[in-house]
């Protein structure tokens, strides 16, 4: 299996139709050579639903564009761009696009071959705006998440980490201003970088890749890279890696 980096365009042909109007594109998985990591996008047309299901691993869900409702055992959370929610192993959840516009999600699993079991929706709906210690899921709002500086002009915040209850994956969003460059040291595990908004030039050794919204690049373990924002507008990238 080829272990080189791999670029996937956000407008590539869908790999799977998970439900009517829901298209899945795999950025990396066991079938593409990734170890312990699957990252993909889900494009949801208005009015579409991913029915209730569970996974034998946790799942990290973040919003690249649009608005969706994520239901976790009946608890309904409305997520917008750069919001994220972690759903632990075995917890039933569903996603609906109740808006009038297409939504694009970014999903991550700590396995090369995620499985799911679909369930009946027998849950009473409770609208919530946040999570707390009484529920197993963990919601991160992009607007209010705690930021930390990677360089004076570059900030990031976590979606999935030990503090959010994530198991086997870690990552979040990094905001890179115009003309700035983020050096990313080599990791001992595989990772994936996806553009939420803006344009990026990613350099790995002597290779350069130009990415725009919803494009993604698989980065194998042991490879360092840098992300440059070549434009005069902001760049948001979601970086997720497997844990050791």
Model-based region annotation:
Residues 21-28, 40-55, 153-160, 170-187:
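Conserved short histidine dyad/triad with adjacent acidic residue
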Residues 60, 67-69, 76, 92, ...:
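Structural motif
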Residues 86, 100-118, 218, 232-244:
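A short hydrophobic beta-strand segment most commonly corresponding to one strand
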Residues 1-36, 116-168:
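A short, N-terminal "cap"/entry segment at the start of jelly-roll beta-barrel domains
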Residues 74-89, 206-222:
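Short acidic-glycine-tyrosine-enriched beta hairpin
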Residues 96-99, 227-230:
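Asparagine-centered strand-capping/turn motif at beta-strand->loop junctions
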Residues 50, 85, 95, 156-159, ...:
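Fold-core signature of tandem repeat domains
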Residues 41-45, 54-70, 108-110, 173-176, ...:
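Short, conserved beta-strand element in jelly-roll/cupin
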């Amino acid at each position: 299996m080829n272990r080189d980096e791999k670029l996937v365009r956000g407008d590539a042909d869908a790999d799977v139709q998970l439900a009517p109007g829901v298209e899945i594109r795999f950025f990396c998985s066991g079938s593409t050579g990734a170890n312990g990591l699957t990252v993909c996008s889900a494009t949801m047309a208005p009015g579409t639903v991913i029915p209730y299901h569970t996974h034998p691993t946790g799942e990290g869900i973040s919003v690249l564009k649009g608005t969706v409702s994520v239901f976790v055992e009946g608890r309904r959370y409305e997520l917008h761009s750069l919001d994220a929610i972690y759903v632990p192993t075995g917890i039933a959840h569903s996603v609906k696009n109740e808006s009038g516009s297409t939504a694009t999600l970014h999903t991550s699993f700590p396995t090369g071959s995620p499985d799911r079991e679909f369930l009946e929706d027998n849950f009473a709906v409770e609208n919530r705006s946040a999570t707390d210690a009484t529920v197993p899921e963990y919601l991160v709002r992009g607007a209010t998440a705690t930021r930390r500086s990677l360089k004076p002009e570059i900030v990031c915040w976590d979606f999935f980490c030990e503090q959010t209850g994530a198991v086997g994956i870690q990552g979040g969003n990094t905001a890179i201003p115009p003309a700035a460059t983020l050096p990313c040291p080599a990791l001992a595990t595989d990772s994936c970088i996806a553009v939420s908004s803006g344009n990026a030039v990613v350099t790995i050794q002597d290779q350069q890749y130009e990415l725009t919204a919803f494009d993604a690049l698989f980065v194998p373990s042991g490879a360092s890279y840098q992300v440059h924002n070549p434009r005069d507008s902001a760049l948001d990238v979601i970086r997720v890696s497997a844990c050791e």
